[in-house]
From Swiss-Prot:
Transmembrane listed as a keyword: yes
Protein name, UniProt field: Alpha-1,3-mannosyltransferase MNT3
PANTHER family: ALPHA-1,3-MANNOSYLTRANSFERASE MNN1-RELATED
Residues with glycosylation annotation: N34, N168
EC numbers, comma separated: 2.4.1.-
Pathway named in the protein's UniProt entry: Protein modification; protein glycosylation
Residue intervals annotated with topology Lumenal: 32-630
Keywords, alphabetical: Glycoprotein, Glycosyltransferase, Golgi apparatus, Membrane, Signal-anchor, Transferase, Transmembrane, Transmembrane helix
Cytoplasmic domain ranges by topology: 1-14
Length: 630
């Protein structure tokens, strides 16, 4: 009996020894794996480190802390978790995260739980304020980029449902959405109504019913962007217009009728931009021109206080980019005139490849942004920790060498970030696949709301490509510089009697063409001067200048009110002949120059003059007359 008892004790002792050996081996193996993972991170030493309040910075420190704990702490976490600073479950999660062995759902849940743990009061609305302290403004911008990319990684591109991921979590998915996108209407799990704009058919005056959804309203609202994108259908034109833009939009509708357009229009508003009188005028013209026009009132999906405080002027365009119901659309300013059908833009190879097509602005080399803006934007790039944990990558970033000659997009990036050139994109017409580019559009909206970044760019123009860039998306920019159309003039003969060979066009319009010299669209309407009362204002401002050239106000007014006479197009080489701004049309008129052997369509050494066939000129000027018809 005694021998049997001793034998059992010996077996039990050996079993305990074996279990402890296995446990220690596991700890050593785990530590070695984590060291390997840490070494991988150190390979990216040239990349920036996450800011102190970053969720990824906290997670990395937590991993280091767990790895450095002594054996007793590890045993305590396993056998006596209530005495440990970290649970065994968290230790396993951190190890899996470091070795990229974790399920995305668990990773995403942990990332956002950490976000709330670091700062229970975090809110992206903080970026809309300008603190005028670089450390504060830049840190908020950095956190904004990190949070939006994390949200995209998990719930937009990642296609996880936040209402399911956070079902048993300390994070409330509705609260997360409220803080991530402060412009959205504040919702909670008790919401009984599906978030949807009020849409009115302006030709009939009837409301368009909201679609039926196959889920509870709280679930729909708690994963709003994925559900919104899922219900977006078809193609169309999208605008946001103020009262002053209504006469221009009516002209645009008449041009669309002339061009036999068949796509619908959606005018997207925050709720109160248009008067009843303006709505009636649009409705009447829509019926006359047989164009389908819808008014999309977003007051039901926007936070009223935030919208009234921060959404104005250029920010309204982002409301239009996000809250139209199309899958693909062409975003237009009211004074844009297309000369090709919508299929041209949607079938463009560069658009089909990237999902968004932008066009270049005039090249103005003497207008620049600020170095402090570049320093701020560099902080928006993914940190080394973010790259490690969720794999964020950008097409271009400040830590990688690249050639500005590889693409138009690379050239624009180089000229903005290295040369500080301010103007690159004309956002009067943008072609967008919303299903593919939603995360970039959300990034753009939030960047354009940023209190500091608003001081770095002109309006919304550059934010279109910057938003896609920092969302990790690609984008396409038409390679032809912004140009000018109008009557072609030749400089006087030289002193020796020979022709100067220099041609110029002066007008207020920005024209856009393709690599085959085809005129695509114009920004600025087709009136010689679109600025109301400009003749009177010009004479009042510079009486001697305008009297010496035009005699009196009535003559200048007749010139300004005339239809633009199009004879040709010039794409200037600004390194030889920069754009010249002149005093006409309240300083809105520019002149561009090109030299060459007569009116040819060849690419000239010093700028390019494009002339049109008789058929092309007839069509272009018919559109000009249509635009200017009463």
């Amino acid at each position: 009996m005694l021998k049997s008892l001793k034998s059992r004790r010996l077996i039990l002792k050996r079993l305990v020894t074996l279990l402890l050996s296995l446990f220690f081996s596991y700890l050593i193996f785990s530590a070695s794996r984590n060291v390997t993972s840490s070494n991988k991170l150190n390979n990216h030493a040239s990349e920036r480190t996450a800011v102190e309040s970053s969720a990824f910075n906290w997670i990395e420190k937590r991993q280091h802390q767990v790895r450095s704990e002594n054996l007793m702490n590890r045993l305590s976490a396993y056998f006596l978790p209530f005495l440990s600073r970290s649970s065994h479950k968290e230790r396993v999660l951190l190890r899996q995260l470091g070795n990229n062995e974790i399920a995305k759902s668990d990773k995403c849940r942990y990332i956002f739980e950490v976000l709330y743990k670091i700062d229970p009061d975090w809110d992206n609305a903080q970026t809309a304020k300008f603190y005028n302290v670089d450390g504060v403004d830049n840190t908020l911008a950095s956190l904004l980029g990190e949070r939006l990319r994390s949200y995209d990684y998990c719930f937009l591109s990642g296609q996880l449902d936040p209402t399911a991921i956070f079902a048993n979590s300390t994070v409330n998915p509705h609260d997360l959405q409220n803080r991530m996108f402060p412009f959205l209407k504040k919702i909670n799990e008790e919401s009984k109504t599906v978030m949807w704009p009020i849409i009115t058919d302006m030709t009939t005056g009837e409301a368009v019913p909201a679609p039926e959804v196959d889920m509870e309203s709280s679930n729909f609202n708690g994963n709003f962007w994925s559900n919104w994108n899922r219900l977006s259908k078809g193609r169309g034109f999208v605008l946001t217009i103020a009262e002053k833009d209504v006469p221009l939009f009516l002209k645009q509708l008449k041009v669309m009728e002339f061009s036999k357009n068949e796509l619908p229009f959606q005018i997207v508003s925050t709720g109160n931009e248009l008067s009843a009188e303006s709505i009636a005028k649009i409705s009447e013209t829509a019926k006359e021109t047989e164009q389908r026009v819808y008014l999309v009132d977003c007051s039901t999906v926007l936070d009223t206080n935030f919208a009234n405080t921060y959404i104005s002027f250029f920010q309204n365009k982002w409301v239009a980019t996000l809250f139209n119901t199309f899958e693909e659309y062409i975003l237009l300013d009211a004074d844009v005139v297309p000369f090709v059908g919508s299929d041209y833009f949607f079938d463009s190879p560069s658009y089909r490849e990237s999902g968004i097509l932008l066009f270049k602005d005039r090249v103005m080399e003497n207008e620049q942004t600020f170095q402090y803006c570049i320093e701020m934007l560099n902080e928006v790039e993914p940190s080394a920790q973010e790259r490690r944990f969720i794999g964020s990558r950008l097409v271009f970033d400040s830590s990688l060498p690249f050639s500005s000659e590889t693409s138009e997009e690379a050239s624009v990036y180089y000229n903005f970030f290295k040369k500080l050139r301010l103007h690159h994109v004309d956002s009067g017409l943008v072609v967008v696949n919303k299903l593919e580019k939603l995360n970039g559009l959300l990034m753009s909206f939030m960047l354009n709301l940023d209190g500091k970044l608003q001081r770095c760019v002109y309006g919304d123009k550059e934010i279109f490509w910057l938003g896609q860039l920092y969302a990790g998306q690609d984008y396409s920019i038409n390679p032809v510089d912004g140009s000018i159309i109008g009557p072609v003039n030749e400089e006087p003969e030289n002193d020796d009697g020979h022709k100067s060979g220099m041609y110029y066009i002066c007008s207020t319009q920005i024209a856009h063409s393709d690599s085959k010299n085809r005129l695509l669209w114009v920004n600025g309407g087709l009136k010689t001067c679109k600025i109301s009362n400009s003749a009177e204002d010009d004479f009042g401002r510079e009486p001697e200048y305008f009297k010496s050239r035009y005699g009196d106000i009535s003559k200048l007014k007749r010139i300004y009110d005339a239809s633009l006479n199009v004879e040709g197009l010039i794409v200037p080489d600004v390194s030889v002949h920069p754009w010249m701004q002149i005093k006409e049309c309240s300083n809105y008129m520019y002149c561009a120059y090109a030299t060459g052997d007569g009116h040819t369509n060849s690419e000239l050494d010093e700028g390019r003059l494009i002339t049109f066939t008789e058929k092309e000129l007839r069509y272009i000027n018919d559109i000009s007359r249509t635009w200017n018809a009463n």
